[in-house]
Amino acid sequence: EVHKTDFNAIETDDPSLLFRFFDGFFLYAFILSWAKDDLLDWFQPKTRDTSKRDFNWLDTMWRRTLISSNSERMIGKLFSISVNIPAFLERFPDAKLLYMIREPLNVIPSGLSLVTGVLDGVFGFWNLPVEKRQFYIDRLYNALIELQLRFHDDWINDRIDKNKVMIVKYDKMMLNFEG
């Protein structure tokens, strides 16, 4: 197994957007990918920008965490902001991001495994008919590619302040995890 996870596992801050607003990339990844019509476009900031609402919620949640833990620094783990990093950095000007890159031939199967692992644990995903599984996997595959393409487009077109983002290569990190 690539990932050991379940529906109750605490993985990132991203699920809080799903549970707070019944919206966000997790809504698409876990639920709307099954829809007859492909609804991925709903999660394009150019089509429907929820970043102000989402960032306000993250700010509230993070402030509560800082107060309750008597801390001064918040370290979040988010992957969905890759669709709109310029807006995130505008809303959180003191933020510093680590953006992990990985060979697409490895990251896509890893992302698919993470989500289908949760779905299998809750709903028995791998027991569904092959056609239903493939329909879902195709949709999720395209969504995961879209996340990478959006970051890349913002990066090469200088919409991301490169002084606030450090790109970390997954393979290099795994070779020297302690260093």
Describe the predicted segments one by one:
Residues R48-S71, L78-R91, A95-E178:
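PAPS-dependent sulfotransferase catalytic domain
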